């Protein structure tokens, strides 16, 4: 029921254009400074891409918290969920903070009483989904869009909508991420099923859509021309187009960009609650949200 609630929410926020929220309030609270700041170890489980962790997360967090050691475990959302599920069964949760892209999972954890209620002073600036008691809050927004290779397709010839992907002219030439591995793909599937019914995916199957392990595999095969167009995260396309001048282009679907709020939460089992809270404060602050934007995602 909780997943169904979030999937319906995702369908409700199918937008005709990309909404870019502000990067925190002007009076956001600084999480810490070099004097009297949080100390100790904090573990973060996240689905943020490894290169973004290395180039954006680690240096910014290290600068904000010089006396705190933050360790990152990265994996696809469903891989992280599988890891946590095993840890819960063993009564040995290994992380303090969670940042993955399956919003419904946070509701499951909250129902199980596993999340720490913490109302960050910056929570008031979050305009996307959040829990009023602070058990979780959106920290970044991911957009699922259609992408194509502009060396292979002219803009006027590219798919203009999700429904366009069912056109027989794209048979065997389209792809999507595996929703069993990708949290954003999972939410996208729910949103499209809610909008068009499950027969939409029967049509995609008949059109020989290929299911790849993740967004990175899709971007690479778009570049080689193996696929003409694909469902993919906007951030993948923007990063390649702007940093490597690759010929990938975004087609914002006329029947709605799928906007996916991705939350942050603290486990009650944390061994360093003050450090974990400081990290949440930072992510929801202006500095943290600017770091999100540097990672080609959208702020909350």
Spans of model-derived segments:
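A ligand-binding cleft/hinge motif common to bilobed small-molecule-binding domains
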Residues: 104-108, 228-247
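Short, low-complexity disordered leader/linker segments with a strong preference
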Residues: 1-41
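Extracytoplasmic ligand-binding site segments that recognize negatively charged/polar headgroups
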Residues: 47-55, 73, 77-78, 93-227
């Amino acid at each position: 029921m909780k997943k169904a609630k979030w999937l319906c929410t995702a369908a409700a926020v199918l937008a005709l254009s990309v909404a870019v929220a502000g990067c925190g309030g002007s009076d956001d609270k600084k999480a810490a400074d070099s004097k009297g700041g949080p100390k100790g170890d904090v573990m973060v489980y996240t689905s943020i891409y490894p290169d973004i962790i290395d180039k954006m997360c680690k240096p910014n967090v290290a600068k904000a918290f010089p006396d705190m050691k933050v360790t990152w475990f990265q994996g696809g959302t469903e891989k992280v969920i599988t890891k946590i599920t095993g840890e819960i069964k063993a009564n040995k949760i290994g992380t303090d903070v969670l940042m993955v892209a399956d919003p419904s999972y946070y509701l499951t954890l909250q129902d199980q009483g596993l999340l720490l209620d913490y109302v960050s002073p910056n929570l008031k600036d979050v305009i996307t989904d959040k829990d009023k008691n602070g058990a979780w809050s959106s920290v970044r927004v991911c957009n699922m869009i259609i992408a194509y290779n502009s060396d292979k397709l002219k803009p006027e010839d590219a798919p203009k909508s999700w429904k366009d992907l069912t056109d027989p002219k794209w048979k065997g030439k389209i792809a999507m991420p595996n929703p069993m591995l990708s949290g954003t793909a999972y939410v996208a599937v729910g949103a499209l099923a809610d909008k068009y019914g499950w027969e939409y995916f029967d049509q995609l199957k008949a059109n020989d859509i290929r299911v790849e392990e993740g967004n990175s595999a899709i971007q690479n095969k778009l570049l080689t021309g193996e696929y003409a167009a694909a469902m993919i995260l906007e951030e993948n396309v923007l990063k390649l187009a702007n940093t490597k001048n690759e010929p990938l282009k975004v087609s914002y679907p006329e029947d709605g960009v799928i906007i996916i709020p991705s939350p942050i939460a603290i486990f009650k089992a944390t061994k360093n609650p003050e450090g974990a809270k400081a990290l949440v404060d930072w992510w929801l602050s202006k500095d943290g949200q600017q770091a999100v934007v540097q990672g080609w995602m959208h702020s909350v």
